[in-house]
């Protein structure tokens, strides 16, 4: 079990509004990104690994009980979420995603997920795991080690926050915005009620058209990590149709909440260069779309435990 940063969609169930951080990213110590930088038109995953963490008997990162406590989500440990489907959209294949998530769940006493198919996941009354390619089939793309670690992080966090939810992993053929967006549409078509997107890339002039094509799904909660390179906005976090999730540093404390939490300067934030400010944003800091909307633990120095 290793410790990593998290920008998981499930955290948007209940979080506080994030402000804009204009500082440079804080030093990461011995943490490192698991995905390389992306060229124009492509995205990079936003996971980091703490390379100082050893394979100890007990995980050193934050576990499900910590996250439920920190964000007052204890009700989700019961029956909440049963029958609901969270989709994880990432690029490339993680061949061991199903077995890995059940190792994570066993570590924390969470019942294992059953196996189901993409077409049946949304109807399952028993928490189950399904995997599809970007068009809903089961011929998967090639493996990528960095993206596979991101997938482990995302699937583990969905399990931690909503153990009774079904999990649908949709793997895009590549990290292009076109392929990832196609995977988002497929996730919605397969019945997902929440779609997590833990990736991002440089903004581009055609993103207003792309957001309408891939992210405009009324009634579906679509969340996107805001990035992990400090001040600046990425797509698709800039979309008006998503909840952009920023990052914090989270530590246990002796206060009433039991936790202290501060903004993490490595999280992406700022003003979009292209997306019009939506009517539901009333801040005066940006003339266009402001990023981020909510925040959760993301600092690699205070990260979560992940099995990969």
Placement of each model-derived feature along the sequence:
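Phosphate/oxyanion-binding loops and surfaces in catalytic or ligand/nucleic-acid-binding neighborhoods
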Residues: 13, 248-252
